[in-house]
């Protein structure tokens, strides 16, 4: 709506959409609230370009070229961007997925289109994707390269205020800021590859991370903030305990395609499992003067943790970094539903749960697990829901929150089971 109004007022003004909302709606997509399939947001909004992903490289390149006087219509070759064009101006090489009208009427076509889209979000192996909208064609260029370590360090060395905008002061502030004000982002991307998750379409499956010095320096700066009470709420990211790419092969050939997962249903034999670097960082941060506690709240991938033969990190996690409750995401317990989700079998979670309580007892701590659970996942049946209820009762779990799946952009196994 705002883009159309801006275009009406200033027809010659270039408009570039970015951020999570635009990124996840760059192709024809299902709208949860309207319960229908919509065309690309590029068509609905009238924007000139969509910058998908985190967007730093794209923003700088587009701004530089616009400042040099280049018309926005000719800026069609920037990695990490999408634009609309007609058939005669499509690039020479591309992979095409089913168009808007086809995917709006055929769920299998939608699922196959989604598979093509997901398989081409890797910076090494990704190709240009084309999808016909109502009239024009959406062209997605290959993804932009993720920021490398020194670039991430520069981004997080900027003088952020760690406060909400002053405009909210008269409204009583933003209570939710308390959880993130003194939290540290240490990585981007996630190779977990859950079928319902949109992170792989935005940040990608390739994990990049900040240097240890950058993270420790940010923590040290926090200790001088007037509101800091000694507690760092999180040192994490999309998945807290991922620091590096999942294997050496992905650096050369890109991420595996065709729905292959690094962790589910079993751990890939090529995956490198190592918590030592993350552990060293946490030790340095908790030793800083003025720091009382360092918590991990952004989610531990428990199957990755259980795949580590060295349990030093697990022991220190339990002893130093749990604020009484640790959030983890088994999501369900029924084998049928877990397979559709791309999650590990519940037996893996059970082993993790037992060890967590065992280590907590040895550490003299009364701590609990808070499981993330999901309802309404496509393919999940009423029988599966009953199975989950019985599992929770048997294991004395009383979750206060359960996520009801909201579809925006998810991968083929989930799509194929949408009604």
Please state what every model-predicted region is:
Residues 13, 221-370, 374-378:
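Conserved SAM/AdoMet-binding glycine-rich loop
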Residues 378-393:
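Catalytic cores of alpha/beta
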Residues 171-198, 231:
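N-terminal pre-triad scaffold of radical SAM enzymes
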Residues 73-92, 98, 118, 144, ...:
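Terminal amphipathic helices with adjacent charged low-complexity linkers/tails
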Residues 108-183:
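N-terminal [4Fe-4S]-dependent radical SAM core
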Residues 406-419:
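Residue-level detector of conserved catalytic or cofactor/ligand-binding positions
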Residues 48, 215, 328, 402:
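Conserved, mostly hydrophobic/aromatic
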Residues 1-133, 140-141:
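Glycine-rich beta-alpha loop elements in corrinoid/cobalamin-binding modules
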């Amino acid at each position: 709506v705002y883009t159309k109004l801006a275009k009406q007022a200033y027809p010659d003004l270039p408009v570039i959409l970015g951020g999570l909302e635009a990124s996840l709606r760059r192709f024809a997509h299902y709208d949860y609230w309207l319960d229908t399939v919509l065309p690309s947001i590029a068509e609905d909004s009238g924007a000139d370009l969509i910058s998908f992903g985190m967007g730093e490289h794209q923003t700088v390149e587009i701004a530089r070229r616009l400042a040099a006087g280049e018309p926005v219509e000719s800026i069609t070759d920037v990695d990490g961007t999408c634009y609309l064009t007609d058939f005669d101006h499509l690039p020479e090489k591309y992979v095409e997925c089913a168009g808007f009208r086809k995917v709006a009427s055929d769920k299998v076509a939608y699922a196959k289109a989604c598979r093509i889209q997901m398989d081409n979000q890797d910076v090494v192996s990704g190709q240009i994707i084309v999808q016909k909208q109502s009239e024009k064609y959406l062209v997605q260029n290959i993804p932009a390269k993720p920021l490398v370590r020194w670039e991430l360090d520069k981004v997080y060395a900027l003088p952020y205020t760690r406060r909400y905008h002053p405009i909210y002061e008269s409204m009583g502030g933003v209570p939710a800021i308390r959880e993130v004000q003194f939290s540290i982002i240490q990585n981007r991307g996630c190779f977990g590859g859950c079928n319902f998750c949109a992170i792989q379409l935005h940040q990608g499956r390739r994990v990049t991370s900040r240097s240890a010095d950058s993270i420790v320096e940010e923590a040290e700066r926090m200790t001088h903030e007037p509101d800091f009470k000694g507690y760092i709420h999180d040192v994490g990211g999309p998945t807290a305990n991922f620091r590096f790419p999942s294997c050496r092969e992905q650096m050369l050939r890109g991420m595996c395609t065709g729905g292959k997962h690094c962790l589910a249903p079993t751990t890939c034999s090529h995956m490198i499992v190592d918590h030592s670097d993350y552990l060293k960082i946490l030790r340095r941060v908790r030793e800083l003067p003025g720091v009382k506690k360092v918590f991990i709240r952004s989610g531990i991938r428990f199957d990755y943790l259980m795949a580590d033969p060295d349990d030093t990190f697990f022991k220190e996690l339990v002893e130093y970094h749990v604020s009484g409750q640790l959030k983890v995401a088994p999501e369900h317990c029924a084998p049928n539903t877990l397979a559709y989700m791309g999650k590990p079998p519940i037996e893996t979670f059970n082993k993790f749960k037992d060890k967590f309580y065992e280590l907590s007892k040895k550490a003299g701590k009364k701590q609990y697990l808070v499981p993330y659970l999901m309802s309404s996942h496509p393919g999940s049946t009423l029988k599966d829901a009953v199975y989950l209820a019985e599992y929770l009762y048997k294991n004395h779990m009383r979750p206060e929150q359960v996520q009801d799946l909201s579809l925006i952009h998810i991968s083929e196994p989930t799509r194929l089971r949408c009604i």
